[in-house]
Amino acid sequence: VLGFQRDDILDYVFNNIKIKPEIAESIVENEDLYLNNATYKLSDTLYEMTGYKNIFALSGSDANEGAIKLASAYQKIIGQNKRTKIVCFENSYHGSTFLNYNMGDSLFEDPLYTMKPYNEVIRLKRDFDPSSVNWDEVMCIMVETCSYGQQLRPNSQDFWDKITQIQHGGVVLILDDIFIGGGKTGTFVGWRNLPVMPDIFTMGKAITAGFFPLSATMYGPKIAEVLP
């Protein structure tokens, strides 16, 4: 998106991460977290491009963990405390932290890092039968825009129809757009051409073209309206 090893970008980043007197003073006095203008500008730009508010993080794993925490907070705020389950799909990859790794598939598993049982995760096949799940217990469903684990083969219209129906039943829909976002599908947001509108979606390397660690958990009006 931005090119490779551009000196102007590297110089801008370097100049902005050098600690400034006001930042040092804020840290010493334990005042509120200091945010520079670039943070606000990027947040505003992403909102203008997507219509979603955001929470910044460092990695895709962080963004996906944040998405699940947002979904959990949303369900609790609206009084749906029984919704604790997380639904994901086979041949998926959502990160390397404990929860996200358990949501992935054995394709990414090795003898030194085996899956641990996590009772809140339900992993389904792509041709799943919706009646096989008690959706009243499900907090959120996480889907990759286009899964690396299934060789980037797009999901079927029938698959997305099921997902939309489940979303309308009160389950928070999270789209993991980290791998495929950033223009790979013809739009900056990878899911724009899909027949679906997520409540939350996540972005990663595409934001900075890999120049430095940054990701974002993007949340729409449904979530924003209930957050304190």
Kindly give the residue locations of the regions a language model identified.
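Conserved N-terminal phosphate-binding loop of PLP-dependent enzymes in the Aspartate aminotransferase
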Residues: 1-228
